[in-house]
């Protein structure tokens, strides 16, 4: 029973991974950053009561649900980029989409840290600028 369940999970996981073009460093980074962003958002609202997503700045289930829905749609857009790559015979649309979303998640994490009063190291600020420029240059190449 246990082996069958594990095998089923492996098959489903492998299928989903193949839909996204593989489980590479970019996709792993995006998923990790999405988790960090969601977690830091919970801390901002639950501990610091300083969220800009709710009227009183504290935890609200609807705001959390909206955040999870956004994360899900983000992954669907990555899936669309991957499938477009396959149809067009290219390999850069998915990467451009993932890099853009990594930059977006990084900005959100830094904003959440700022709402908690955490000082942001300049190297992180510079890395965000590099990610933004890379995403913009890939957008221009795709036009």
PLM feature segments, named:
Residues 32, 41-44, 48-51, 65:
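N-terminal intrinsically disordered, cationic/polar leader segments
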Residues 87-115:
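Hydrophobic alpha-helical transmembrane segments and immediately flanking/interface helices
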Residues 51-74:
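Juxtamembrane helix-capping/reentrant segments at transmembrane boundaries
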Residues 46-59, 112-122:
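A cytosolic-side transmembrane-helix exit/cap motif
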Residues 16-27, 84-93:
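Helix-coil boundary and interhelical linker segments in multi-pass alpha-helical membrane proteins
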Residues 11-16, 79, 83:
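Alpha-helical transmembrane segments of multipass membrane proteins
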Residues 30-41, 74, 78-82, 100-108:
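Alpha-helical transmembrane segments of multi-pass membrane proteins
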Residues 106-139:
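Canonical alpha-helical transmembrane segment with a positive-inside/aromatic-interface signature
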């Amino acid at each position: 029973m246990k082996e069958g369940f594990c095998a089923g999970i492996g098959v489903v996981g492998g299928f989903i991974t193949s839909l996204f073009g593989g489980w590479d460093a970019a996709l792993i980074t995006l998923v990790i950053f999405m988790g960090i962003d969601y977690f830091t958002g919970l801390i901002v609202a639950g501990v610091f009561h300083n969220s800009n997503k709710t009227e009183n700045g504290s935890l609200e289930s609807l705001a959390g649900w909206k955040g999870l829905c956004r994360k899900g749609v983000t992954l669907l857009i990555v899936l669309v980029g991957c499938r477009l790559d396959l149809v067009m015979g290219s390999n850069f649309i998915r990467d451009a989409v993932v890099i853009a979303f990594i930059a977006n998640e990084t900005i959100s994490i830094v904003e959440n840290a700022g709402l908690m009063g955490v000082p942001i190291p300049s190297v992180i600020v510079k890395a965000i600028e590099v990610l933004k420029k890379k995403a913009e240059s890939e957008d221009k190449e795709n036009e």
